[in-house]
Amino acid sequence: PYTTLFRSVVSQSMREKGLDYKLNFGIELPRLKEIAARYEKNHEVAQALWKENIRECKILAGMLQPVETFYPEIADIWVEDMRYPEIAELTCMSLFQYLPYASEKAFEWMADEREYFQLCGFMLMARLLMKGNQLTERSEAEFLDQAMATLQSEGVLPRKAAATALKKFAVQSKENGKKVNRLLAPLTKSDKVEIASLAGEIKLETEYWH
């Protein structure tokens, strides 16, 4: 039933937009990428797919959404809809990191109290740092501030994402590595085991790269 439902939802959505869509099930990520690669990016199709509360539909939506018509307010609506970290991660990877306003959104979302906004904010920041984006002095201070606060917060998902973003920042340069290690020093002695171990893990990776 699940597979049939997915197949019919997607094929109907694609048919309405004039795309012939045949789906064989067993939908792993590489297969979804293959499916998406066969089609032109299409705003209406992507929006229709996103509205379906089905994992594969949401993953495909991120792959088929054109950047040009994906306005900041739609980005917020999508994040509001997210319920699974996998969807957050894949949408950041296939769509969010390519948005012209990606950096602004990363900062806005990192500072948001809502779990999935923070999660996407740090995941997006990690992606941008991996692409070699350099932070200005002011944005660097804001990022480090936000990441350190999140590392010590209760939210497990944002905490892990903040740790990943800190690692990506730290490995960009020796100078960045030193800054991060200085900030982490007190946390490695934290009474909270999970915080101390996350801090230790970031420190270890930073030292490995430098």
Language-model segments: residues:
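Alpha-helical scaffold domains
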Residues: 1-210
